Structure formats: structure tokens, C-alpha cells
């Protein structure tokens, strides 16, 4: 089932579902509850009921790319297990139904005022202490005092743009019109505080391509990175409007909501931006349009130094922009949703996005190669591996992500620098990869030097015992000098106890000089006020003891 209409949800006051609070952002119920008929009920505008218990109307964004997402037709509309909520409208306000008319609601049979009056009965005496009732009365009093004006909301129009009311001239005056200026105050609720962070009302992400963030396809609704990707610095960079620089790299800006109530949500405050693993994408704007920056100006972007026109001109004159504009508009197209059958087999349902016209970046190629190899689609991977730069990056990313299958395939198919790969595996502490690479022909002396400078005592010990036919002074000296350079006192102790007979006084003095240079470097370039060189001092003392042993052994 394909479906592109805007869907709506009706909520009560307080907003709850199955006795659990719901609100702005990501809301989810368990699949178990969903199967029991306790999911979220959604309506098309043309099927909004005349009588339904509720206070608020909520346009919803469906997180269709969530693997747990379930969506099906029901006798009353649609039924799902997760929704993302942002805007909020009062059902006691006729303007809400005028807005719904533009989405397909028929007001011929029952006028907007009559429908609003029908819903207003829920503001009964037993709710006089409720937030909804107080909010309703405050808006009614403000209107009667002449402090408010009506605003009409066009479908898909930016919430930042005001336009004239088109209330019918023959409509009844029921005496309590609630203005949408003040409803915006209610809907622009600040994000739920997360770990003590006070988040701005509006946050944004910037992308080069319309449906792609980095190498990841994105769409309207919930978009997630895995925790592994997040830890590899592949999460979303989320900006406050005031921190958007003049020459940021990108062509589209998306307003986002942070699903702070999601159990797997992660957020880091990095001073000038936020770093997170999931966002809910709402609206999309072109950075080549001055109106985009005027909207951002309302959320804190400074337009005094560079005007909206000057900022937009940077992107309008960009060559890639001319290509991208041919397939874009101000707002995201409606998402196409796929039906999830009653078996709920965790089928992934995603919005339809095509990237066939988007040139593949190096990162995209690398990501695709990893996926092809994991799926045993080796021919597809081989075509992309012909580029040397791509090949090198595939090796690097495979080692850093501990992807042994990719490394095995690359060793079988290509000639690459085993020694560099071993060095990177040790630097990244990927010992499984290191042990696999050791099975092939490699430079043992170079590997021993790397293990010594990085402090891998077990590897040094095994190599000295098994990988060399004969231990000599040159080999021991390589270990000693590299251990001194890396400040690895345990390796120096190892040499002093097992191979002291191969060490000369000159070798020790050279190692001492290396450690003294290390101390000088630490004291000169360290940013810490409390400089710790205790390990280096212990090494110098150990070298003095070693010199005494070497000198005395000659007599």
C-alpha cells in the first residue's frame, strides 16, 4: 500500500496514550501492545471524525526507516506503533478545521465553527483546572481584549510565514476564536532537557545532497546511526541557528527534532554544535534562498554582518548547486509508506529516495564496498576497488572497524602493504586483525619496532622467542631504542632481565638521550600545568642500573 497524504492524530489533555505521557518528538509503543490493539490511531484530513474525544490535533511524521515500524489500514483510518510529533493545534478553534480543509476535509456538511463547537464541549467543568482549559480561556480573553489576530496556515507552508486569514464571511461568530500566534507558542515547546542540557527550540542539520547525510540515506521522520557508527564519528552534527557560519559546506538545511525520550538516544554537547545518533527530520530548505536565512534569523542567526541575500549568494553561485536545484524545492516531498502485514516480521519500511543521479563520493564507495563484501557480492566490490585511493581507505576503515572478512578478501584479491596494515592494526589496538595479518609474509623487524614503541610486551616477547632464528645485539637495540622513544618502561625492564648480555654501554647511553629528549618535548609542548614525567625519570634510573651491570660484567 502506497500512501502520501498527511496524517493526523487526535490527543487529549494531558496528552497520554495507554496511561503513558506522549508529546513532541519520538513516541513509541511496544510491538506486544501494538498487536493487542493499543497502537496510535491516525486519520487523513478528509476522515477526521465529527465526534471524537480529544483536545488537540497533531500532524504526524512517520519514522518509516525504523526497522520496528509497523503501519496498517484500519476501519477508522490507520494504525501504527510509532509517531513523531511536532506541531499542535486546538480542536476547539475553527481555524484548525479551515487548515484541515486544505488537506481535504469537507466543510460542506458541517462548518468549521460547528465542528469546533462540537469539540469544545470537552472543556467541561471537571476540566476547569486542566492546562487545556486554562490555555483555552487565556487565549479567549486575549482575543476579546483585542490583543490577537487570526492567522491561517497553508499546507506545507513554513511555520515561520504569516498569511491572511480566510475565514468564511458567512461563518458563525461563536465568540471564542483562538489565534494561531499563540498556538505557535504552545507548539514551539522547547526540547525535553537531556542530561541537564537546555536545548534550543529549533535545531538544524546541513547536507550537500537532499536525501543523503554523509554516506547515509535520510528521509523525513526518524533517522538513526548505530552506536558503532556514532562512536566512529559518523553521527549527526546538529547546529543551533546562531552557530551556522557563513560558508558552511552544504546546499540544504533541515529543521530537526531530537527524540530525547528514545531509550537509545545519545547526545553530546560540543560547544558549537551537538553530536547525536538520531534526529527526526521535519522541513527542508535550500541554502541558496534568502528566505531560508530570514527564517534562521528568527531563531538566532546574526544577519547584521552578512545579510540573508549575501549568505544565499554564496550557494546560488556554487556550481554543484545548479545541478542540485533542478531536482529540489523548498519542502520535502511527501513520503511513500509501505504496508506492514499482520505478521510483523520486522520488515524495514523506508521512504522512497533515489540516489542514482548523485555522484559517488569516496566515503560512499568505501561504505558500499564493505556492504558488498559482507553480502558476498564480490564482483560489485571489485569494480569500486579499482581506485587506489578508495582501496587504501577500505583497508584503513576495515582495520579500524575490526572487519576481518573485508581484510581476508582484500589479501586474496589485491597486493597491499601488509606492513602498513600491521602498523595500523597495532596503533588501533585491533589484535584480531594483527594476528590474522601475521599469517602472511611481513617485515618482522619493522613489526617488532612498532610493538616496542607502542608497548605491546606480549607481542615483543613472542616475537623474540619464536620469530627470529638468532637474537643479536642489533635486534635487542631496536627494541630498547623504540621502547625509550615510546616511554615504555615495561619493555625496558624486559630487555634488562632477559637480554642484558646483548646490550652495550653505548646502546644504553643512546637510549638515555632519547628519554631526555622525550622529557624536554613533554615539558615544552604539554598543555597541562601538572606535567608528569615520573615514568621517564624511572627509566633514567633503570638505565643507570643497566650500565652498572654491563660495566661490571666485563670484569
UniProtKB/Swiss-Prot annotation:
Protein name, as recorded: Putative ankyrin repeat protein L283
Keyword tags: ANK repeat, Repeat
ANK repeat residue numbers: 364-389, 390-420, 422-447, 455-488
Top-level taxonomic group: Viruses
Organism name: Acanthamoeba polyphaga mimivirus
